[in-house]
Structures are given as structure tokens and as C-alpha cells.
Amino acid sequence: MRSEEEIKTAYAQINSLYKDAVNGDEKAVQALHQTLEQVRSNHANIPLLNAYHGSIMILIARDKTNPLEKLRWSKAGLKLLDDAVIFSPQNFMIRLLRGKAAHKLPEKHFNRGHTAIDDYTFLIKSHERGKGFLNSKAYWQLIYELGEVYYRMGRNQDAGICWRKLKNETQDPAFQRLLLSKLKLVEGKPAVETRTEPEGPFASLLRRIVNEAQNQIPDNSQQTT
């Protein structure tokens, strides 16, 4: 297959399967991983393909049950996403892929809340300047999730600003109720606080593995399942 056709086929498969992969279809995740691993072996310097592969690795980590495997795949995916942003920092889709991945990762184990904030803020401000590709629903979703990240990091004032902005813009009754419930979480709270969450057995095990293995994990950006 010629290079142009191989790349075009990869993007077509991404368009076909990526949403299913995000929604929990493990077969779609594995199909995209195999395709992207193959095309990247021939075209290693396409930032958007690297970012998609990094995002898929985060989904592979999601589906793993072994904590160390979760950590390995998450680390590999984040490396590809970070490198893609370094090479193409103004690419809206790359920033969206990395921001969404960072938003989903547990803050206490990965400390990537700042990454989600950087990427989401870039996308939101770009949209407000008339740039980018977000529709109104996606724009509101990013502001809502940005508020969630701020809240998880103990930045109550910033979280409240995000949720109040949405409350003033939306007319949807269900969304209004959700935002009111979120605003109650930060009502009367200090602007910034240290937030701790109860740690269950699985989280405790993952924390120990992270602490013990973080500096010993090789770069698995070419790893297969």
C-alpha cells in the first residue's frame, strides 16, 4: 500500500471506530491500536496519528485490570500525547485528545490536572476568538469538565467561575440543576484548598506501584498487547 493510501485508511478507521473505542468497545480499541502501530512504524513523524495512538493507549490502560499494566500503558500514551503537542502545539484535535486523556486520569496518581487545564483553556479561548472546530455543545462540555478538574485540584473559585458561566448561558433545565448541584460543592469554601479523597484497597495498591515502579518503567510507546 502506498504511503498516502495507508495514512488515508488509518484516518478512515479512526473516524469509524474511535467513538466506539471511547465508549468502551474493547475490540475497537484493539483494532485501532493495531492499525496505528502499523502505520506509525512507517510514518513516525505525523503528530496527529501519534496523538490518536497515545489516546488509544490510554483506553488500553482503562481496560487493563492489572495496576502495573494500567500504569505502563498510561505512561506510554501520555508520552505520545505530550510529544505530539510539542511538535504541533496549535493543532486543536491534538490538544483535545491530550486534554480529554488528562481529564480522565486520577489526579492523585498521575498529577495531570495541569495538562487538562492548559489544553482545555487553549481550546476554550480559541473558540471564543472564533477559531477551532468546537460546536456549542462541545464548548460547554469543555467548560464543565474544566470546572471538574479545578474542583479535583482544590481550586474552588476557578471551578465556580466555570460552572457559573455555564449556568448563565444555558437554558436547559436539567443542565441548570446539575450546575446548581456543582455550585453547592464550592459554596462557602476557600478559593483554594487541599482536597483529599478516601483511598480504597485498589487505589492504595496503585499508589504503591506508582511510587516503586515509576522510575523503572521503560518507554512502551511501541508496546503491543
Task: Walk through the language-model features, giving the residues of each.
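Terminal, low-structured helical/coil segments at or just beyond the last alpha-helical repeat
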Residues: 133, 137-142, 149-225
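Helix-turn-helix repeat elements of alpha-solenoid scaffolds
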Residues: 21-36, 70-79, 112-125
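N-terminal leader/linker segments that initiate helical-solenoid repeat arrays
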Residues: 1-40, 47
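Short coil/turn linking the two alpha-helices of tandem helical-hairpin repeats
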Residues: 19-22, 54, 59-68, 104-110, ...
